Each structure stands twice: as structure tokens, then as C-alpha cells.
A protein has these predicted regions:
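Acidic-and-aromatic substrate-binding clefts and catalytic sites of carbohydrate-active enzymes
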Residues: 16, 25-34, 42, 54-61, ...
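Substrate-binding cleft of secreted/luminal carbohydrate-active enzymes
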Residues: 49-51, 207-212, 233-314
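Active-site groove signature of glycoside hydrolases
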Residues: 98-105, 122-153, 278-279
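Aromatic-lined substrate-binding rim segments of carbohydrate-active enzymes
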Residues: 32-101, 154-175, 218-232
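An active-site-proximal structural segment forming one wall of the substrate-binding cleft
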Residues: 38-41, 45, 73-89, 108-138, ...
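Aromatic- and acid-rich polysaccharide-binding/catalytic face
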Residues: 134-143, 147, 188-217, 283
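Catalytic domains of carbohydrate-active enzymes, especially glycoside hydrolases
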Residues: 3, 28-58, 196-203, 270-278
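Hydrophobic faces of well-ordered beta-strands that scaffold small-molecule active sites
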Residues: 5-12, 50-52, 93-97, 137, ...
Length: 314
């Protein structure tokens, strides 16, 4: 069997309105059964992980919370629907501890005491509501900042602070980050030292091919360098976050469409020798079975689903 994608990011609503053109309207009408069907579809492709990117967006929560009002969507508790179905499917779920500030300002969010306090309060509530689920595997910190040569001091402080909170309230849960700026990493001794002092279990670097910061032929060498650095640091496991999309027009300012599968196949092959796990961004909106009762995305998402399902049979 071909090396596949081990998991996927998962969103209740895409944060960038232009990018989510083809699936936000569908997601906004989803019932609990629609969310459950999406989890079953992901499980059918043998994926092991779901990363719920955001548990709040635009000052609204996707669960009953004292932090923000409940989002105005048909499903009153999509987090419960996802976790409960994941329990049945044997999928491991990471819950995002954002966005409890403006998602466009991660530099503010990781340094603002007010935003961090809100996220910690939400984490307490998420733990109280959902810790009984066997599928609740860990936490994802979505306020990512760009790696410029190495992780910034502010970002490292933020990650370690969040991880300390996770250890306190859910000592059995794992932690995940998925930084960008992967093509800018300088994996020298300073980078290795930073990795060694970063308290996180998994780092899923964005391959940045969909956003055109990295060309397909470059990603293998980048991940080879990162693997050597991670091995020397001896702490966080190296994962890959591969982008399954292309843009309809301008990068970041137009709709996301499913990428050509030949490109995605190369992306998988490039990182597979180095990454312990491969997470795709993302199943939601970019892949749909033809007969899905919970279709969300462009019609071309059917073809990407078909091609990927066939690839898994090789």
C-alpha cells in the first residue's frame, strides 16, 4: 500500500472568507449528522488524526462557553459531534486552543495576556466538557508565527506557556504546532538548541507548496535538513503539513481549489522519508466522495477524492 496521508486539519468555518468561497456556505448549514459523516469519510480513507483548527472564530465559540457566545450555526455542539464520531471510528483528535483573538494578528495573540487568558479559560471548559472522549488526543496551538531562520523568542515562550497549561489540566494529552516559514529555516546549532528547549510533542511544518512559497522540487531537501536537526535536538517529533490546495486566483485573496493529485503525490513522496506523520491541509472542502450527503467544496473535490482513494490501493 502506498504511503498515505495520516491525518487532516478540520474546520467548522474557514477563517479566510475569500479562500472558503466553495465550502463555507455548506459548512454553515451543517447539522451534527453532517459533521459525523465527515468524520466517517475521513476514517474511510484510513486517516488516523483530525486536527480541529479552531474551537472559536470571530468572537464566537463552537461549544457552550463563558468566553464568547455560541456561534450561530444549526449544530449547537460540532465539537461533541466530531469527538463522539471519532470515538467510534478510532480517530485521534487534537483540539485547537484558538482563535481567542483576531486570527489575522498571531503576533498580538501570542503576547497578549488578555488573549492568552481567554484561551486558557476555554481550554479549561473544553477539558471539562470533552475529556471523557477516548478520541480527545491532544491540543493544537493555531496562533502560528513565521519562522525566520528560527523560532522567535515570543513564539517559544508562548508555546511553552501553552504546553505547561496542557500538562496541568490534561497531563495525558499531546501537543502540536504547525508553523510556516519552513523554507526560511536555518538548521544550524542555534536552531537545534531552540528545538531542544521547545516543549511540544509534534511539529508539523507547512510544506508551503499551495501558497507558492516553496516549489515541489525543493521540499524534500528542506525536510531532510529538518529531520537531521530534530534528530540532534532529540525532543519534538517531525511531522509534515502538506497543502492539498491551489488558489483560484491570487494567493491568499481567492478561493482554494483541490490541487492536481500528481502534485500531491510528489508532496507525499518528498516528505515521507523524513516525517513521522503526514497531515493534510485539508480534507474539508477539498475532498468529497461523489455520493456524500454532506458535500462541501468545489465539484473538482470529487476527482481529488477518487484519485487519492485509488492511490491508497497501490
Amino acid at each position: 500500500m502506498s504511503r498515505g496521508i495520516d491525518g487532516t486539519f478540520f474546520e467548522i468555518h474557514h477563517h479566510n472568507t475569500a479562500e472558503g468561497k466553495y465550502w463555507n456556505p455548506a459548512l454553515d448549514s451543517f447539522t451534527a449528522e453532517n459533521w459525523r459523516e465527515k468524520v466517517r469519510e475521513i476514517a474511510a480513507l484510513k486517516m488516523e488524526y483530525i486536527v480541529v483548527m479552531a474551537t472559536a472564530l470571530y468572537d464566537r465559540c463552537y461549544f457552550e462557553s463563558s468566553v464568547f457566545p455560541l456561534a450561530d450555526i444549526p449544530c449547537a455542539d460540532p465539537i461533541e459531534a466530531v469527538l463522539d464520531e471519532a470515538d467510534k471510528c478510532g480517530i485521534k483528535v487534537f483540539l485547537g486552543n484558538g482563535f481567542y483573538g483576531d486570527w489575522t494578528k498571531p503576533g498580538v495573540n501570542i503576547t497578549s495576556g488578555e488573549v492568552i487568558d481567554r484561551s486558557f479559560k476555554a481550554m479549561d471548559e473544553l477539558t471539562e466538557k470533552y475529556a471523557h472522549h477516548s478520541s480527545f488526543y491532544g491540543w493544537y496551538f493555531p496562533d502560528e508565527t513565521c519562522i525566520i531562520l528560527r523560532f522567535s523568542g515570543d513564539f517559544m515562550k508562548y508555546v511553552n506557556l501553552c504546553s505547561a497549561r496542557c500538562h496541568e489540566i490534561t497531563p495525558d494529552k499531546k501537543t502540536l504546532i504547525a508553523p510556516y516559514g519552513t523554507n526560511l529555516t536555518l538548521t544550524n546549532s542555534k536552531y537545534i538548541d531552540a528545538l531542544a528547549s521547545l516543549d511540544v510533542d509534534f511539529i508539523a511544518y507547512q510544506d508551503e507548496i499551495g501558497v507558492k512559497k516553496t516549489r515541489v522540487w525543493q521540499s524534500e531537501r528542506i525536510f531532510e535538513r529538518l529531520k537531521k536537526a530534530h534528530d540532534k535536538a532529540g525532543r519534538a517529533a517531525l511531522w509534515a503539513d502538506i497543502e492539498l490546495f491551489k488558489f483560484e486566483g491570487m494567493v491568499y485573496k481567492s478561493a482554494l481549489l483541490p490541487a492536481d493529485f500528481k502534485r500531491i503525490e510528489r508532496q507525499i513522496a518528498n516528505v515521507a522519508p523524513y516525517a513521522d506523520k503526514i497531515i493534510g491541509y485539508q480534507y474539508i472542502g477539498l475532498m468529497n466522495p461523489e455520493d456524500s450527503g454532506s458535500f462541501a467544496g468545489h465539484e473538482s473535490s470529487v476527482e481529488l477524492y477518487r484519485q487519492y482513494a485509488e492511490y491508497l490501493k497501490k
